[in-house]
């Protein structure tokens, strides 16, 4: 099967379609707005269709974090998520980072698999992160999302 290659570019503006994607990965608009102000938002296009998004944020000297990454639901399971992760890794290298980090929920089974397949390793678990930072309970894959699983990749 020939996988379509995404066109990934620095996002110029934030609109409802982009917010819908960002909110797939993070249900808090306030938190999304906060890291959009501080990070760089990259949009991914399959032809003329917005297919995905990720946000890179410099968190410490020599370290960047993918603070949000999402693929449009109708386009998931087509390898686009992997393209986004690999693009973020390349961008981090070009920024001179030594480490790239990402965090996801304990219930995000597919994401945990993807990140490890891309070379990330589990670094830590922030217990009850989602209970402390989100007003609404989050459920995914029939599991309550409670803990943040932190992963890293040395570049």
Curated annotation (Swiss-Prot):
CoA binds at residues 69-71, 77-82, 111-117. It comes from the Bacteria. Residues 6-155 form the N-acetyltransferase domain. Its EC number is 2.3.1.-. Keywords: Acyltransferase, Transferase. InterPro entries: Acyl_CoA_acyltransferase (IPR016181), GNAT_dom (IPR000182). SUPFAM superfamilies: Acyl-CoA N-acyltransferases (Nat). CDD domains: NAT_SF. One of its GO terms (molecular function) is acyltransferase activity, transferring groups other than amino-acyl groups. Probable N-acetyltransferase. This is Uncharacterized N-acetyltransferase YvbK. The gene is yvbK.
């Amino acid at each position: 099967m020939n996988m379509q290659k995404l066109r990934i570019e620095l996002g110029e503006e934030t609109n409802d379609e982009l917010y819908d994607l960002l909110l797939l990965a993070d249900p808090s608009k306030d938190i999304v707005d906060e890291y959009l102000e501080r990070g760089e938002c990259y949009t991914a296009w399959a032809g003329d269709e917005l297919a995905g998004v990720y946000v890179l944020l410099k968190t410490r000297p020599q370290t960047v974090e993918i603070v949000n990454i999402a693929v449009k639901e109708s386009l998931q399971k087509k390898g686009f998520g992997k393209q986004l992760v690999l693009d973020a890794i390349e961008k981090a290298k070009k920024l001179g980072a030594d480490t790239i980090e990402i965090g996801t929920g304990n219930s995000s089974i597919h994401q945990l698999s993807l990140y490890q397949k891309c070379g990330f390793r589990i670094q830590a678990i922030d217990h009850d992160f989602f209970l402390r930072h989100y007003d609404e309970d989050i459920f995914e894959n029939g599991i309550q999302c409670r803990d943040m699983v932190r992963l890293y990749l040395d570049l």
